[in-house]
């Protein structure tokens, strides 16, 4: 199987995001790289599903809370930028302040 550099990067994001999801599901707090991968993968998958950029930006801020990540991680991530492929091409998606609530109830 031959992968382009972009496909190789996407595969790495997916693998890191899957590890992050498993850890989150077990109640393990995510570190900085896991958090970035988790959000980035979600953004790429929603783009693939056909969501528009505005919807993705809005919903991505409710994926994780301070309860889900290690201390200090929310302060280290003021934005996440990803270039997913949409049906009409690749677009830059910027999610500002992706970790907003302290608890799940505050986000919902």
Swiss-Prot record:
Subcellular location: Cytoplasm
Gene3D superfamilies membership: Urease, gamma-like subunit
Catalytic activity field: urea + 2 H2O + H(+) = hydrogencarbonate + 2 NH4(+)
Annotated pathway: Nitrogen metabolism; urea degradation; CO(2) and NH(3) from urea (urease route): step 1/1
Main location: cytoplasm
GO cellular-component term (any): cytoplasm
EC number in record: 3.5.1.5
Gene Ontology molecular function: nickel cation binding; urease activity
InterPro entries the record matches: Urease_gamma, Urease_gamma/gamma-beta_su, Urease_gamma_sf, Urease_subunit
Single GO BP term: urea catabolic process
Entry keywords, A to Z: Cytoplasm, Hydrolase
Annotated family: Belongs to the urease gamma subunit family.
Subunit structure: Heterotrimer of UreA (gamma), UreB (beta) and UreC (alpha) subunits. Three heterotrimers associate to form the active enzyme.
Protein name from the UniProt record: Urease subunit gamma
Taxonomic source organism: Haloquadratum walsbyi (strain DSM 16790 / HBSQ001)
Gene this chain is encoded by: ureA
